[in-house]
């Protein structure tokens, strides 16, 4: 009888196992940052696994055969062998990796299933410009914002842990058939598990689906003169290997996916129209260090009517420690393509910024109309620390954003004048220079706005809001007005293009020639104020592009305390940068600050000395001419020539008693040599 019971027990046990179903393991996918680590607990990985019978599941076996770093932490619970997987991507690794795991039924260990834990290591979506005294983070989605750690990415002076800009991004808006379209991002997207689709990297395409698309385009390309010079000097040798970034340079798009064929600019050594660094071709860039990015507006925030525009950006810096202006400036070139089939009229482009100058609780925003600049400064004399955020103390700086070249004005067949009448401006370029249809707007509008609260001065939430802010209106469609908080409810009456010009509009351009009080200073009643400067309007036709050049200029006075001390420093640096831009980047560093290394031998730079400087009516030019004579010209801050003469000896006295006091620039043309020097008459 006992033997019979034993046999029956075995039969019933086998029958139960036969009726029990095996667990189901489901593949997992996770996205991580470039060179990052992940820590995944067993229950997280098994979260989508299940047992049809409701039994408890446990890890049984985990195996990995890749090249990255993987480790397992064991658990003390008897039925589970592993509690956590640690994965760390090796330097330079991008793309797919995988870990195999087996789960088992705790009640019936012979029942199990196998699945894969896929890990997608994203491209390095950001990199730093760090050649001068600013360390600036450039991400494919956003400028100067560390969207991995949620902190400021614009450190200045470099290495001191203090920053002035939390984030910045271009905004575009226009009308088509009286419907408003816009493309605007603020802080960009984050690479979090399964959130890669919120990244905006890559050209306008038919399809943005798939990890391979994001692997190729969710990145930036950092190039340097060192790599460029190496390539130029060695590309023709057998077995030469170009720098990896040269091989990856996004010169061409995939036309089968609807992308434009020609994308990032390059020097075509053999003029065949095809980028190939093994033929000597190389990226074309500005500065001695540059970061290039391409983004689309397929994914964007709060803008359902997207414009189908493609933005190419090049941020760059120069290595010139002896020039304080160059040493404290980051440049940005934007080329924006209309890849749609729509013609947008009344189009504006702006630069939005969240400016956290040290401690952001006491920041003030204002603008300098004549210098085509908006800026942030401290509201009181001391910029205190705020928790982990380091303030600038008793020497708070100024951080400016300058429109060196705004949007091109629509062609009208005339040379529009420098002035305040319609189709004229006082802070653009090409106005009144005798050349037809070469005019570019300067900064046409500026406003700070609140992060929250007001229904008319708060953060934009739809296409109409973005268009209004870019074109000089509040969210309730009322024009900016001079005085108060810039809204008609604040007491102002006269329409204006600019809020808080702080006495900088010498021609009263912003108010259409109406004379208004000389000073209207910034206010920080907006809370954590953010600001937008814009340029336009212009017509944006299909397949056309618009080009802008911006400069982020930092100024600080290390000898004088107080919140006003840094203003003249920033203004002087802006003046220098604007002059350099108008004169092919001639700098005190010696000759031209090159936009890219030329494939030829450079000319040895001559030495130029001017004294006294500052001066009253006369100054002396000490310069050894290479030719029998050299041509000297003096320009004011607007690029207008105010004096000229020839240099025929090693020392030449120049009399400029007939010009007013101020900052000027001396340009000497000596054969192929062109030298530049800033002077101050007082």
Question: Language-model features: where?
Answer:
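Surface-exposed or secretory-pathway low-complexity segments enriched in glycine-proline
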Residues: 40-88
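Short strand-edge motifs at loop-to-beta-strand transitions and within beta-strands
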Residues: 83-85, 546, 650-654
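Extracellular recognition modules
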Residues: 86, 100-104, 665-669
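A long-range scaffold signal marking pre-active-site subdomains of enzyme folds
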Residues: 122-593
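C-terminal outer-membrane/trafficking sorting elements
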Residues: 600-611, 615-682
